[in-house]
Amino acid sequence: MRDQAHLASHERALEAVEGSPGHILDLGTGTGTAALAAARRFPEAEVVGADISEEMLAEARRKTPPELAGRVRFEQADGARLPYPAGKFELVTLANMIPFFDELARVTAPRGWTLFSFSAGPETPIWVPPERLRAELERRGFSEFADFRAGAGTAFLARKREQV
């Protein structure tokens, strides 16, 4: 996600998130663009940007503005084996990222949200069709699905049920 145009569908989906998530995870954060967008959208939230690449995380830390540095942190983590407790995050975001469905379901809190965005829609190399996202997430206790489009991008938002 190189610039704000690439964030359009992601930000549209963020606007649809009900409530004020206190803990947000941006998985596959790369240089932190989506994590910083979440921090701006939810000014009370603590945001964790996780990525396997220390080089990307170094860039994310470098570009984090001072006004967000106190509540945004970047950590090295493998999306297939996240080091966070079950139900830790009220919002989990993935921008142009391979979905690790079991781990997403595990770390998303009951009634929490998971947001997938693809900056070039179906042209994104790792794009996952909304039908597949819905099917995989329904099997893992999610409901209340919504699709978003803005520019070339697409986003998909799902809410986890209270009890799975």
Region locations from a protein language model:
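Conserved alpha-helix/loop element of class I SAM-dependent methyltransferases that forms part
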Residues: Q4-P21
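A generic alpha-to-beta junction signature in SAM-dependent methyltransferases
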Residues: V17-E18, R41, T108
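Class I SAM-dependent methyltransferase SAM/SAH-binding core
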Residues: H23-L27, T31-R81
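A short acidic, Gly/Pro-enriched loop at the edge of an enzyme's catalytic core
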Residues: A80-V92
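A short SAM/SAH-binding and catalytic strip from SAM-dependent methyltransferases
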Residues: E90-F101
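A short glycine-rich, Lys/Arg-flanked "PGG" loop and its adjoining helix->strand segment in the class I
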Residues: F101-W113
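Conserved class I S-adenosyl-L-methionine
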Residues: W113-E136
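Core SAM-dependent methyltransferase catalytic element
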Residues: R149-V164
